[in-house]
Amino acid sequence: MAAGGAGGNSGKTYSFKVVLLGEGCVGKTSLVLRYCENKFNDKHITTLQASFLTKKLNITGRRVNLAIWDTAGQERFHALGPIYYRDSNGAILVYDITDEDSFQKVKNWVKELRKMLGNEICLCIVGNKIDLDKDRHVSVEEAESYAESVGAKHYHTSAKLNKGIEELFLDLCKRMMETAQAEERLKGNGASQSASSRRGVQIVDDEPQATPAGGCCSSG
């Protein structure tokens, strides 16, 4: 179900599915753990197939429930990607700024997502590990130019230093809310059900509660 108009959404709860994609060792799991639990482990954490975390937020008086899927980056798990990104409202495509190949693999994911889900999914391209900027192999200009060319937004993050992560997820949530609200307006005008509606955006009337902006998070 899609969202209502911007003027009457103060009592709504939005439920969104977000998937993280990218090569192994780019730091996807570290980003999610830093965002949800404010934890960081210097040791590489290998994700097998996928892990799942949730985050609850209050954004401009509207409650948002995020279901965040962290997928495995190993090539042997690539074929499982569609299982996790179908029905997603947003995708975070992560590369390591010190690894040019990981950036090229992001381009493959973008092509696949656009082919399977169309243009309505909100895409974020993330250059992670900016704490290693002296070893950078992907230029800021190249990455930002590419993101703009495919209708995505680009972000720089460091899970180690806890930089850029809150901004990334907050901005993505706002974009998904805007998309959902636009779909609800179309629905109110008698338009046929859209792709994002079919992807399962859930917005329900709710009694607003005083939830801190940071929200809470639990593993599932």
Sequence positions of predicted segments:
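Conserved catalytic network of the ASCE P-loop NTPase/AAA+ motor domain
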Residues: N58-G61, I83-D87, R114-N119
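Conserved Switch II/interswitch segment of TRAFAC-class P-loop GTPases
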Residues: S88-K107, L117-E120, D131-H137
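Conserved P-loop small GTPase signature centered on TRAFAC-class small GTPases
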Residues: M1-C25, R63, E120-I125, K129-G220
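Walker A/P-loop
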Residues: T29
